[in-house]
Amino acid sequence: MIDLAAERLAAEAGAEIVRRGRSEFCERAVVDSREAGRGDLFIGLAGEHLDGGRFASDAMSAGAWGVLVDPDHGADLAGEGAGEAWVLSSPDPERSLQALGRA
């Protein structure tokens, strides 16, 4: 379990809260949307061939606690879904993941 409340998690990650979710704590972080489920924070990393942020909506549909994506994807996701998932935005999701690893 990630032992950080949502606002502290965002602060540690250097991320902005774009939309608040329902649950205060997430259980784990994942970078593969196919593995995302209830309680997970999906982090959309940009790769050589794919931008993981494109799959954040899939993670939310799978019940993810929230998503951490770049600002463009964050703006797109702000109004998506029923409002259960947190949407966090960071200019560099990879750096945010590293910061969470140190927190």
Question: Model-derived features: where do they sit?
Answer:
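Short, basic phosphate-binding NTP loop
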Residues: I2-A103
